[in-house]
């Protein structure tokens, strides 16, 4: 059964986004009486479609399930990547339950973001996370924050780690296992080529702890899958 996030709710009916209405009509070619899942306020409902040929009516049949139980809440700091790699990271991070994604600019970031295209980028990234949430049956969509410089990142989670290419640091799995009861985790990823030593040291001063992936050097898009 198809799943969509509702824009708003009025009495016993939901209002969907225009893109989702188009998908129902033109892509899925659904008919009156077909059922879909609708997610609203972190709760999933089974709904029935009516008036599909005109202004779709989405009526609640029954409440199905409550919100996700992803714990701890993970904030992922992702360097701005080329479009295809960025899309992959956003999709997989969403599927794996990340709560918040903060795009960052580092010394080795190749893609530049300015005020003129930031809103457009965030809108696109949010859409990708929304579609990944629907596909993976989440009841929440990760929050996409505005792009920040790596120097502006602060350690606000219970556990704050920065992914290092050094073999001398603690293994990430060991650190997470010893903090398995924490409520929030902040993870800073590096771009292709990794973070500079200066950037890592600045994050450590701000409360982050360096971790390693053992003797492996991972592609940047593989990091969320490993953690």
Predicted regions and their residues:
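Short amphipathic alpha-helix with an adjacent loop that forms part of the alpha/beta core around
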Residues: 152-156, 173-180
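Structured adenosyl-cofactor binding patch, chiefly the S-adenosyl-L-methionine
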Residues: 197-227
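A C-terminal functional module that forms or caps the active site or interfaces directly
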Residues: 182-202
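Mobile, glycine- and charge-enriched loop segments
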Residues: 36, 65-77, 176-183
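RNA substrate-binding interface of SAM-dependent RNA methyltransferases
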Residues: 67-161
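N-terminal positively charged helical leader segments and presequences
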Residues: 1-66
């Amino acid at each position: 059964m198809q799943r969509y996030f509702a824009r708003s709710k009025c009495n016993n009916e939901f209002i969907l986004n225009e893109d989702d209405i188009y998908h129902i009509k033109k892509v899925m070619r659904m008919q009156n009486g077909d059922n879909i899942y609708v997610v609203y306020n972190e709760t999933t409902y089974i709904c029935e479609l009516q008036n599909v040929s005109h202004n779709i009516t989405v009526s609640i049949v029954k409440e199905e399930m409550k919100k996700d139980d992803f714990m701890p809440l993970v904030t992922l700091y992702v360097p701005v990547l080329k479009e295809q790699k960025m899309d992959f990271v956003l999709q997989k991070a969403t599927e794996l339950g990340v709560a918040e994604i903060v795009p960052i600019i580092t010394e080795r970031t190749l893609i530049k973001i300015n005020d003129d295209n930031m809103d457009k980028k965030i809108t696109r990234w949010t859409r990708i996370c929304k579609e990944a949430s629907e596909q993976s049956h989440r009841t929440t969509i990760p929050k996409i924050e505005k792009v920040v410089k790596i120097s502006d990142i602060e350690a606000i989670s219970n556990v704050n780690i920065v992914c290092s290419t050094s073999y001398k640091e603690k293994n990430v799995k060991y650190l997470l296992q010893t903090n398995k009861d924490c409520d929030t985790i902040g993870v800073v990823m590096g771009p292709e080529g990794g973070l500079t030593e200066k950037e890592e040291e600045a994050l450590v001063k701000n409360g982050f702890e360096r971790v390693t992936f053992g003797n492996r050097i991972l592609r940047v898009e593989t990091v969320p899958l490993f953690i």
